């Protein structure tokens, strides 16, 4: 999908995966669409008021983290040990400031922790207990790990462990938001629970600046979803931005080219992006991807590849 230019724009995703992500459960599909609408409305309201892209992407991502339909925050998938470990990153294209966290177990809002680290921390990336301690000392809400765990996720873990190496970890997962504000500044945010039955300490592409998340006012803001190991190897988000900066591809061409490269390695997934001029694009190589867009003309959400965006 590719749209023309407008004053501001917000694009979000709730993960790319197999077609069964919603077709098997109409109630889940309705809840997921409502969750996308809620996140779009909140982020769009910020941009309509002339506020910043970084505020918009944090707000949209925070709402998606709170929605148990998506694999981020509450409702995330479980590790091999039956716990939730969360990853998140945020980046401001105006300054290229960034914050990233991984292995989060007790901080309710990982994306807000990533922003707090970006704005007030001494480092760009914190992991594990140190990141949760930074969150606690920064006044961010702490919860028991059980807060994030849903019975359905325990069932999925049991199935994955029983299937062993035959299990397919790419169902759906990760949430993300990219935005351009009225001043032409772009920002990106990505948050995830990872993949079901992941090994303790596994880190995917989402919190890695340049792999799953990237923003640069000279090019675009990008958020990724999919088989993280392949997106890391392709440095996917930065590669989209680099192709734009070279000036030889449109935003849509850059996304399609990077996804094709990832597919050649054996990976699948999706990307969303916006440019400082207000252009927006997305693409995915799976049968479905939760996604939505808001601009001055309205809002739209979609899931399946056959759906046509307005």
Annotate each language-model stretch with its function.
Residues 2-310:
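Alpha/propeptide regions of enzymes that mature by internal proteolysis
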């Amino acid at each position: 999908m590719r749209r023309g230019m407008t004053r501001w724009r917000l694009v979000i995703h709730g993960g790319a995966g197999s077609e069964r992500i919603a077709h098997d459960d109409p109630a889940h599909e309705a809840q997921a669409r409502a969750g996308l609408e809620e996140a779009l409305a909140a982020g769009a309201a910020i941009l309509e008021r002339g506020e910043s892209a970084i505020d918009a992407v944090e707000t949209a991502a925070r709402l998606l983290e709170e929605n148990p339909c998506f694999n981020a925050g509450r409702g995330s998938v479980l590790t091999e040990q039956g716990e939730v470990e969360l990853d998140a990153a945020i980046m401001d294209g105006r300054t290229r400031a960034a914050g990233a966290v991984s292995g989060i177990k007790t901080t309710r809002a990982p994306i807000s922790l990533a922003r707090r680290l970006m704005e007030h921390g001494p480092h760009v990336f914190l992991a594990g207990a140190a990141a949760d301690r930074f969150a606690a000392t920064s006044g961010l809400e702490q919860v028991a790990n059980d807060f994030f765990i849903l019975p359905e996720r325990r069932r999925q873990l049991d199935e994955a462990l029983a299937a062993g190496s035959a299990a397919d970890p790419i169902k759906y997962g990760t949430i993300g938001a990219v935005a351009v504000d009225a001043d032409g500044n772009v920002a990106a945010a990505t948050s995830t629970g990872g993949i079901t039955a992941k090994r303790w300490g596994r880190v995917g592409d989402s919190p890695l600046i340049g792999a799953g998340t990237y923003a640069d006012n000279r090019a675009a803001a990008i958020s990724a979803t999919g088989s993280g190991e392949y997106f890391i190897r392709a440095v996917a988000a930065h590669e989209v931005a680099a192709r734009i900066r070279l000036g030889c591809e449109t935003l849509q061409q850059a996304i399609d080219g990077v996804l094709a490269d990832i597919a050649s390695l054996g990976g699948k997934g999706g990307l969303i992006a916006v440019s400082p001029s207000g252009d927006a694009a997305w693409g995915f190589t799976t049968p479905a991807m939760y996604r939505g867009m808001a601009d001055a003309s309205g809002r739209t959400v979609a899931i399946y590849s056959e759906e046509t965006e307005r």
